UniProtKB/Swiss-Prot annotation:
Coiled coil: none annotated. Pfam families: His_Phos_1. It comes from Bos taurus (Bovine). Homodimer. The lineage of its organism: Eukaryota, Metazoa, Chordata, Craniata, Vertebrata. The keyword Hydrolase applies. SMART domains: PGAM (SM00855). Interconversion of 3- and 2-phosphoglycerate with 2,3-bisphosphoglycerate as the primer of the reaction. Can also catalyze the reaction of EC 5.4.2.4 (synthase), but with a reduced activity. The keyword Hydrolase applies. Belongs to the phosphoglycerate mutase family. BPG-dependent PGAM subfamily. This is Phosphoglycerate mutase 2. The modification Phosphothreonine is found at T3, T152.
Length: 253
C-alpha cells in the first residue's frame, strides 16, 4: 500500500548539454530549450495537482533554476528549499568541458561509455592546470567542505556514496514524517537515489537514462520501498524520445 509520494526531476537541458560537453560541477546555465522543459515540468505538476512541503536541490544553477521555474509555475515559491553539494552532478574531472562526441571519436565510444556509465571507474582527475579548476575547486560555495570531501573526479559509485548519506539523514526522515518532497537535481545524483529505492544492480543503473525536465513520480510504502514502477509526468512519446536522446550522448557523430 502506498503511503508516500516522491517527485524528482532532472534539470532542464543546459547550455553544455546542448553543446554535448561533459558538464559535471561546471555551473552551466539552462539553455532556451531547458528553460522550456522546466516550464513544461511545472505545467505537468500543476495539471497533476501536486503540492509539496519541502524541496531539495544541488548548488548548481541549472538544477536550482529548474526548481524555481517549477515552484513559480505551480504557485509554491514560498516553500522551503534545501541546497546541497551532495546532490550535485557527478564530477567528470579532466573530461569537464570536453565535447562528448569528439572525445568518443578520439578514445572510442566504449571508453567514453565506461567513463560515463561504468559504476566504479572514474574519469581522469581534474588537475590544477585544468581550465575550469579554479572556477570549481576554489569556488566559495564549496569553502565549507571538510578535507577530502571536495572531489577532483568521481565514478557513479563515488557520486552515490556522497549523495546517499544526505538521502538517509535528511530526505528520507522528512518523507517518513509525511512531508511531500520534490527533488530537482542531476542525472547521476538522481540515479543514485533510484538505485537505492529499487535495489538495482550496478549494471542495471548504468543503463538507466533519465530524461531532462520530465518529472519522475514514485509511490512508496512506509519503508520507502516503491509500490509501483516509477512513472513520468508527460506523454509516452515525449518520454521515449527524451530517454533516447540521453542514451545517444556518448556516441561519435
Amino acid at each position: 500500500m502506498s503511503t508516500h509520494r516522491l517527485v524528482m526531476v532532472r534539470h532542464g537541458e543546459s547550455t553544455w548539454n546542448q553543446e554535448n560537453r561533459f558538464c559535471g560541477w561546471f555551473d552551466a546555465e539552462l539553455s532556451e530549450k531547458g528553460a522550456e522543459e522546466a516550464k513544461k515540468a511545472a505545467q505537468a505538476i500543476k495539471d497533476a495537482k501536486m503540492e509539496f512541503d519541502i524541496c531539495y536541490t544541488s548548488v548548481l544553477k541549472r538544477a536550482i533554476r529548474t526548481l524555481w521555474t517549477i515552484l513559480d509555475g505551480t504557485d509554491q515559491m514560498w516553500l522551503p528549499v534545501v541546497r546541497t553539494w551532495r546532490l550535485n552532478e557527478r564530477h567528470y574531472g579532466g573530461l569537464t568541458g570536453l565535447n562528448k562526441a569528439e572525445t568518443a571519436a578520439k578514445h572510442g565510444e566504449e571508453q567514453v561509455k565506461i567513463w560515463r556509465r561504468s559504476f566504479d571507474i572514474p574519469p581522469p582527475p581534474m588537475d590544477e592546470k585544468h581550465p575550469y579548476y579554479k572556477s570549481i575547486s576554489k569556488e566559495r560555495r564549496y569553502a565549507g567542505l571538510k578535507a577530502g570531501e571536495l572531489p577532483t573526479c568521481e565514478s557513479l559509485k563515488d557520486t552515490i556514496a556522497r549523495a546517499l548519506p544526505f538521502w538517509n539523514d535528511e530526505i528520507a526522515p522528512q518523507i517518513k514524517a509525511g512531508k511531500r518532497v520534490l527533488i530537482a537535481a542531476h542525472g547521476n545524483s538522481l540515479r543514485g537515489i533510484v538505485k537505492h529505492l529499487e535495489g538495482m544492480s550496478d549494471q542495471a543503473i548504468m543503463e538507466l537514462n533519465l530524461p531532462t525536465g520530465i518529472p519522475i513520480v514514485y509511490e512508496l510504502d512506509q519503508a520507502l520501498k516503491p509500490t509501483k514502477p516509477m512513472r513520468f509526468l508527460g506523454d509516452e512519446e515525449t518520454v521515449r524520445k527524451a530517454m533516447e536522446a540521453v542514451a545517444a550522448q556518448g556516441k561519435a557523430k
